[in-house]
Amino acid sequence: MTQDGYMQQEEEEWEREGLLDPAWEKQQRKTFTAWCNSHLRKAGTQIDNIEEDFRNGLKLMLLLEVISGETLGKPDRGKMRFHKIANVNKALDFIESKGVKLVSIGAEEIVDGNSKMTLGLIWTIILRFAIQDISVEEMTAKEGLLLWCQRKTAPYKNVNVQNFHLSWKDGLAFCALIHRHRPDLIDYGKLRKDNPMDNFNLAFDVAEKHLNIPRMLDAEDVVYTAKPDERAIMTYVSWYYHAFHGAQQAETAANRICKVLKVNQDNERLMEEYERLASDLLEWIRRTTPWLENRTTDNTLPGTQKKLEEFRSYRRQHKPPRVEQKANLETNFNTLQTKLRLSKRPAYMPSEGKMVSDITGAWKGLESAEKGFEEWLLSEMMRLERLDHLAQKFKHKADIHEEWTQGKEEMLVSHDFRQCKLNEIKALKKKHEAFESDLAAHQDRVEQIAAIAQELNALGYHDIASINARCQRICDQWDRLGTLTTRRRQALDEAEQILEKVDLFHLEFAKRAAPFNNWLDETREDLVDMFIVHSIEEIQQLIDAHESFKNTLGEADKEYKTIVGLAQEVQPMATQYQIPGGLENPYTTLTPEVITTKWRDVKQLVPQRDHTLQTELIRQQCNENLRRQFAEKANVVGPWIERQMDAVTAIGMGMQGTLEDQLQRLHEYDQAVVQYRPHVDDLEKIHQEVQEAMIFENRYTQYTMETLRVGWEQLLTSIHRNINEVENQILTRDSKGITQEQLNEFRTSFNHFDKKRTGRLAPEEFKSCLVSLGYNIRNDDRPEFRRILAIVDPNKTGYVHFDAFLDFMTREYTDTDTAEQMIDSFRILAGDKPYITADELRRELPPDQAEYCIRRMTPYNGQCAVPGALDYRSFSTALYGESDL
């Protein structure tokens, strides 16, 4: 039977039965009056007499407007009969417009106060607006309401609902309905079937006080009537149905709102955490980069060594936590973007200068400055070490030269030859010739001193002023010596015409002794000369050169004996011929004793030089062992890192097993990396020894500690990034309900077009991938493709990553929540009003969620707005990015 047919049958039964039972009419009048007042109070009015108060049609129209939520038009305000009939007809027309056929009910009977017709009209309204919308398993409203009551009361003792009259006489059915939905309000176990009055009054009082259901029946009328009025009972029971059904809807709506708000609050917390971490990391980079870009030192070796120690401390202590912070920041950003996409929220755009790309760029700048800083420090150490060596060499040669020049100027300006005899003059001349030879031999040393000073100038030696001053003094003195030598030679040439005799032995001694003495001086310089080598080959070259030098000592010993023999030849001759001053050699200041002393010094320095070279050879061998030790370790760690990186990349690009299998394998790789960390630490210790030994090259391996550090950091970052991507894919799969087969299909298509295995697709590759999956995109439909690109690449990077691609494809296969669903949920809480109040939010939502909504909602300014009304529509659309919050 249709709903309209049921309503027509109900009206006909009401006319027949109502005429026969005045008690039912009394019950209906009370129940219908209470039902009408429960709605009219929403408009600030009520009725006292159901026949009289509806006669002018005004409150009847108002009642229909309240229960339907629609406007019936402007009523006639006149008091004439035709005004009242017109108003009642408007109400009747509205009822008929809802598909209700009114039988035997006319406006005139209502205006005349006909009790039967008025009650019949109200019953028709109750059927249409309170009972007709009750639907249970395609039954009529009455049958559906009865079935609902039977299901709700089935578990209760002494309750057997079969109709809407006798089944309710003991009041237990009403108590059972309340207890079923609100067990906290009634202790059903204490109720008795033989105490109906208490049962009714308890149910009516609890319903009115706690469930906002008005008292429409009197216990006496039901208990003491043989057969209670069915329509009165149905009217009252329908309130229970709507009250409990609405509570269930409100709970569902509240849960939906809480879920959405919690997601939104969690996302906001993630955004705030990202902003804080990004600001902290960028500030650290901003502070650290200028320090790394500072290429100044105090130009001393200890100061530069201190700066190198500071840099090593930065590498070991300060940078690793920041590397981890950067990885966490990227992971949090990707997780946040995934959550936003899954909840259909707009993509998160960090504040200006805090994008992941900005942080990556700043980090690259930091690492570039770091690499340049380390290279500069090492080169500066080598430069300063070279400077220190050159300064010591300059001092040593300058000391020898200044020692040699002592007294030379006084000798050259002396006029001693004026009192000499001929042989003495000739001796002075020969002596001067020997001095010139000695002077020429010292020319190389002076040039070496000047060259060293020039190199110190070019390399920026810190105490270059004293070097230049000393070099200038030596050069000036050397020029004066040259001038004075020329003058004295001219003077001796003039005196030579007078003085002829020459002591050949002295002359021969002087000729031989001078170069031999220079050779001794140079040899002593070479034997005590400092050296810097960086390899076994270099020290071996010095050892070979020293061995070659030792092979020449035999010839030198012969020359020494010859020179000493010449001096020894003079003594018997001077004694024999009593030559005045014959033991003094007029041609040279050198004596056999000096030559002997220097020769003895040279022979003592040779084994010392042997020991020094052998000590350096041992040190270089130790350095070579360090190189080999580092290379052996690096040649194991480097390939291991590369294999792990290849394996992690293969997992990220592959499709073997489920996502959970991939995630487990990634965690296993992560654990393996953690366990492998001691090998890297051991390598760091060896590298520390290498640096302390000042070893700068290693021909046994292609790996440097810097490349291994970078590879290690990239491996950690790759593992964590892949774990994050797989977790996001699992989250996407589970939240969207896609199958593993669908996920594999998406990954297969994505990998097919990702030729370079970069984990991203260019726009044209992405378009081809969509077409391969059956997504229809015409070549001439560029706006549609641009719309899709805006979804998968909101930051306009020019590439589509797999997680964005997966999110887009899941939209095509799964249902999603929308702003409209949120609006419908708030409308249920608001009782179908276009606005909601703070009290309603606090009543239906948890305190923190309710206060969150109250702070964010804007005032509602539409029609029928009450003070404090809030606009939930704009709030809901703003949550989904469809308007500004």
Swiss-Prot record:
This is Alpha-actinin. It holds the Pfam family CH. GO terms for molecular function: actin filament binding; calcium ion binding; IgE binding. It comes from Dermatophagoides farinae (American house dust mite). CDD domains: CH_ACTN_rpt1, CH_ACTN_rpt2, EFh, SPEC. Belongs to the alpha-actinin family. The keyword Zinc does not apply. PROSITE patterns: ACTININ_1, ACTININ_2, CH, EF_HAND_2. The lineage of its organism: Eukaryota, Metazoa, Ecdysozoa, Arthropoda, Chelicerata. GO terms for biological process: actin filament bundle assembly. Residues 741-776, 780-815 form the EF-hand domain. F-actin cross-linking protein which is thought to anchor actin to a variety of intracellular structures. This is a bundling protein. Ca(2+) 1 binds at residues 754, 758, 760, 765. Gene3D superfamilies: 1.20.58.60, Calponin-like domain, EF-hand. The keyword Transport does not apply.
